[in-house]
């Protein structure tokens, strides 16, 4: 499987589908510990990404991700827009103008995305945020890429599975960052919506490569 601009556009298309299909679920997660708008914001943001991709027709994966970053920053409200915008922007920079992505560069892009989220949101693992999905995903991607037999699909699968496990693992945590932190102990018992949407995004990347 070659990860090129066709894959990138397919990934972002599947992201939009995932956000539309899981819109109500994300709203419900956010209603429990946030302000109820995460599902609506993510759905709206990725629909806008599809419109921009159709207009611009980017020629490289990096260009597609940069366009995504700019669109999410302008269209997604709350903290998610700047955080996801920074993640996609950092990933696009890591990819550069490469026409195709190898396992090592893919892992670098996922690490860069995680680092961007950490830098922007000032959150750490265990704070009950999307970092709890992205950090295990980035680490799993690095490990998969370091394997001599590692493939791009293997890197994506490892990242998605780690993100999904990380999102589930936010449920018992007490939030230390974001709006959920205002609830204190009452934030425990609920999955973080940002971690949940992060897992959807990384699972969509697998679907685009399958």
Cite the ranges covered by each PLM segment.
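N-terminal loops that bind phosphate or other acidic moieties
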Residues: 1-210
């Amino acid at each position: 499987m070659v990860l090129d601009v066709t894959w990138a556009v397919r990934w972002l298309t599947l992201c939009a589908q995932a956000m539309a299909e899981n819109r109500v679920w994300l709203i419900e997660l956010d209603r429990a510990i946030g302000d109820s708008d995460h599902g609506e914001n993510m759905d709206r943001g990725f629909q806008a990404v599809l419109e921009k991709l159709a207009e611009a027709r980017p020629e490289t994966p990096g260009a597609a991700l940069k366009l995504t970053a700019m669109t999410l920053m302008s269209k997604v409200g709350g903290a998610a827009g700047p955080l996801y915008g920074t993640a996609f922007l950092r990933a696009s920079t890591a990819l550069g103008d490469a026409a195709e992505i190898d396992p090592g560069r893919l892992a670098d892009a996922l690490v860069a995305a995680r680092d961007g989220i950490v830098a922007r949101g000032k959150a750490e693992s265990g704070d009950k945020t999307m970092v709890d999905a992205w950090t295990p995903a980035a680490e799993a991607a690095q490990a998969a890429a370091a394997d001599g037999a590692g493939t791009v699909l293997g890197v994506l699968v490892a990242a998605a599975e780690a993100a999904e496990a990380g999102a589930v693992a936010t449920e018992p945590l007490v939030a230390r960052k974001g709006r959920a932190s205002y609830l204190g102990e009452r934030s425990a018992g609920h999955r973080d919506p940002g971690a949940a949407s992060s897992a959807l995004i990384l699972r969509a990347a697998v679907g685009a490569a399958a």
